[in-house]
């Protein structure tokens, strides 16, 4: 998984790809938390990065749900 993926890059993905990325990030977060609990985690910063990635994916999905942004290849927002 890419470290620090930008919201612009996420907006280029389809809904299915976003959901898959969300699943992967949640799985990685679970594994990182498990490593932290057992004292095996070397990079504490990665926890924060993964949580932010999850939030970014949720944000892009919510924007599409509300019609604030369209999927890849579509126009963003509405014209007035």
Curated annotation (Swiss-Prot):
It comes from Mycobacterium leprae (strain TN). GO terms for cellular component: cytosolic large ribosomal subunit. Pfam families: Ribosomal_L29. Belongs to the universal ribosomal protein uL29 family. The keyword Ribonucleoprotein applies. This is Large ribosomal subunit protein uL29. One of its GO terms (biological process) is translation. GO terms for molecular function: structural constituent of ribosome. The keyword ATP-binding does not apply. Keywords: Ribonucleoprotein, Ribosomal protein. PROSITE patterns: RIBOSOMAL_L29.
């Amino acid at each position: 998984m890419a470290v620090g993926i930008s919201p612009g890059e996420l907006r280029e993905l389809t809904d299915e790809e976003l959901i898959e990325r969300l699943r992967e990030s949640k799985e990685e977060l679970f594994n990182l938390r498990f490593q932290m609990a057992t004292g095996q985690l070397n990079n504490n910063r990665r926890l924060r990065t993964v949580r932010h990635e999850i939030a970014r994916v949720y944000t892009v999905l919510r924007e599409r749900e509300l019609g604030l942004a369209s999927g890849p290849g579509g126009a963003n927002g509405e014209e007035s």
